[in-house]
Regions:
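Extracytoplasmic ligand-binding site segments that recognize negatively charged/polar headgroups
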Residues: 39-46, 72, 88-224
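A bilobed periplasmic-binding-protein/Venus flytrap-type ligand-binding module shared by bacterial periplasmic
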Residues: 144-151, 185-188, 261-274, 293-294
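Paired acidic/hydrophobic, glycine-rich loop segments that form the ligand-binding mouth/hinge
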Residues: 85-95, 212, 229-234, 249-250
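Conserved C-terminal helix/tail region of periplasmic/extracytoplasmic solute-binding proteins
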Residues: 325-355
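Mature extracytoplasmic/periplasmic domains
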Residues: 267-329
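Periplasmic-binding protein-like
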Residues: 127, 140-141, 183, 200-205, ...
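Early extracytoplasmic/lumenal segment of secretory-pathway proteins
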Residues: 30-100
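A ligand-binding cleft/hinge motif common to bilobed small-molecule-binding domains
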Residues: 101-103, 224, 229-247
Length: 355
């Protein structure tokens, strides 16, 4: 986890040009300091960091700290901070995946975004607007199977490969990956509301798990080294690793990829000045130019009307909206409610067997 404090630099103008520097200025001139969350690696920080540098050039009284990590590590710390210092959030605003944003609904973590402060929210596709605008959709990713091409001669074809005999001791994934619990249940006669089949499958095949990780780098290192051969993973990040020269491939299972939207949101506990800064940043990130550039750099799919993709993205079904047409869409809101119970079951029925 990395914190970076950005202050004004002349570089911002060179990076962004006139259009990016025309973003709104915070009205208050008293010093304002916030923390903005971004994901680490795979170009995910490029656009928000550029936007933040430009904003601070226009608003020298504002200090924006960057917290760079992942939601798995950071979100529980945000919840803990809200319990102890509700008026002083650990993170004021930033990027959150669908797992964290739905958990935040249960934990009452999010402010409603004010459309008057964030007019670009009206350009987001309706299906990616949230109840009471407690966060807003930004990009969509697909989850499929990433694998080591040196170790796997034929690309995997099904989610069930993760618990098949051919991958004993060769599977890695994030710990407590509720999507993998759900897909195992769905493929074995259950669903989100009947999870017994899924837990039974993973319990019976716990020996397939080489390691459960909590960072992108850990998962990548296991796959590249050949210690693990296969993992459920995001199509855009997989594609970036492949372009970097990693000996990896990516496959969309025959049952479909898993839809995984990402969001921008503002945390509860912000004061008026902090809310204004966060709203300005969210609004600027939602511009068609920034949404397009973020999607192009990260190979994700913008959900902002008018955003554009590269020819490379348009021609690759794993990187454009085609992947969403046949995607598995878990009931993320129900998953958020059940996550505490499911984590306990995972510990008892699956992780216990890894000791």
């Amino acid at each position: 986890m990395k914190r970076i404090a950005f202050r004004s630099t002349a570089l911002a103008a060179a990076l962004l040009g006139c259009s990016a520097l025309s973003m709104p200025s915070a009205t208050a001139q008293e010093p304002v300091e916030i923390t903005f969350f971004i994901w680490a690696g795979s170009n995910q920080g490029v656009v928000p960091m550029e936007v933040i540098e430009a904003y601070q050039k226009e608003n020298p009284h504002v200090t924006i700290n960057i917290l760079e990590s992942n939601n798995t590590i950071t979100y529980p710390k945000m919840v803990a901070a809200r319990r102890t210092t509700p008026d002083d959030p650990l993170v004021h605003c930033g990027f959150f995946n669908v797992d964290s944003i739905t958990k935040g609904d249960v934990d009452d973590m999010w402010e409603s975004i004010d459309p008057e402060l964030v007019p670009n929210i009206e350009t987001v596709f309706d299906q990616y607007r949230r109840p009471d605008d407690r966060g807003v959709g930004y990009q969509m990713l697909g989850i499929g199977l990433i694998y080591n091409k040196d170790q796997v001669s034929e690309p995997p074809t099904s989610w069930s490969d993760l618990w098949s005999e051919g991958y004993r001791g060769r599977v890695t994934m994030f710990d407590y990956d509720t999507r993998m619990m759900v897909v195992a249940s769905r493929l074995n006669g259950g669903d989100e509301r009947n999870m017994d089949p899924g837990f039974e499958v993973w319990s019976e095949n716990a020996e397939n798990l080489k390691a459960l990780v909590d960072s992108n780098d850990a998962l990548k290192n296991l796959l590249v080294s050949g210690d693990a051969w296969i993992a459920p993973w995001f199509s855009p990040i997989s594609y970036i690793w492949i372009k970097e020269g990693a000996p990896l491939g990516f496959a969309v299972p025959e049952e479909g990829a898993i839809a995984f939207p990402i969001f921008l949101t503002i945390a509860k506990g912000v004061d008026d000045a902090e809310r204004k800064v966060c709203s300005d940043l969210v609004n600027t990130l939602l511009s068609t130019e920034n949404a397009s550039r973020y999607g192009q750099l990260t190979y994700s799919i913008p959900v902002v009307n008018g955003a554009t993709a590269t020819e490379e993205q348009m021609s690759n079904p794993a990187l454009n909206l085609e992947i969403a047409e046949s995607a598995i869409v878990p009931d993320y809101n129900f998953i958020a409610e059940m996550t505490p119970e499911w984590r306990q079951r995972w510990d008892r029925e699956v992780k216990f067997k890894l000791r």
